[in-house]
Amino acid sequence: LGAGKVGVTLAAMLEYCDFCRDTFLADLRRPSIPDLPKLHFKSIDFTDDRRLESFIRGKDAVVSAAPFFLNQKIAAVCSKTKVAYFDLTEDVETTAAIRKLAKRSKTTFMPQCGLAPGAINIIGSSLAHELPSVRSLELRVGALPLYASNSMKYYLSWNTAGLINEYCRLSDMLYNGRRIQGKALEGIERLTLDGTEYEAFYTSGGVGTLCETYEGKIRDLNYKTIRYPGHRDLMKFLLYDLNLIDNRKVLTEIFDQEVPVTETDVVIIYVNVVGQDHEGIHQRSFAKKIYGDHLNGRRYSAIQLSTAAGIAGVLEIFSKGKLRSGFVKQEFIHLKEFLKTQWGSRIYSPDAGASVTDLVR
């Protein structure tokens, strides 16, 4: 549900998956995508309860790639029709509401799929399990333009409302073993990867359910978004000095009208774990850069490929009957299992070097 950037990318990926027989894509208007043998498009207004229920009924699984504020409605219909539910939301309140629905469901409910939350949680929890005692788990993710000439050093590559939402809400974390919340845009740090300098700061949602899972088990756990240096200060100016945090609709409209959209982007993933065993203190890390590529004769951005691959891998695991009913956390899946999936391995494997185009031939 949702034929935006991620929805159409997921549909294109599922075309090559043996576990998927048919893909049904729904939105108000058909997107500009090639005709694919498995793909069936349906025009639906998601606020029309009757048509939404009719479309969902009888399907094996529903993926909501719709705006996060529609997910509660979609999840409720899935609960009613006993259809498995997955989504891409990073919104904490939406996830909490869906979790309540999942308590009385006999099918799988797995929100927060995709990149962050999503694959980053699978990676982080799997690294943490390699050490018997973990001091810290640091999750760092950024979707950045490869080239940027504006003052923000940023171009749009995904949903603007979701982006601004992450900059405005509180960030969950563990500090000295306790669950606390930090203010988005704070906790700024500098890091250098492959000779390029970046900044990272707290944003909302990316940690998913990891704080709940590891409270009392890991001393310090946090998630930060990676940007080019200087971006954070300009966002603080817009949100707090101009008080657009109380008028996010205006800020969203300004971004959509004036900030260019790019498909020439890079997704940066960096996870660092420090812990100890009987031999001493050890560090485990995962670093990956994902770039845009072509699929079905069309170019997809890095954020499209990384987000869609996160959910495609989860769907493959679900198709094998390996996900339980009710609410399922991302960290329920081990990285080794995720990297065995078709798209998990192609996009997220540290050794993946071939292009997406080569891999699907």
Pin down the residues of each PLM region.
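Hydrophobic/small residue at the entry helix of a nucleotide-binding pocket
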Residues: 6
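Conserved N-terminal Rossmann-fold NAD(P)-binding element of oxidoreductases
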Residues: 1-2
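NAD(P)-binding Rossmann-fold cofactor-contacting core
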Residues: 19-35
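Conserved Rossmann-fold cofactor-binding substructure of NAD(P)-dependent oxidoreductases
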Residues: 45-59
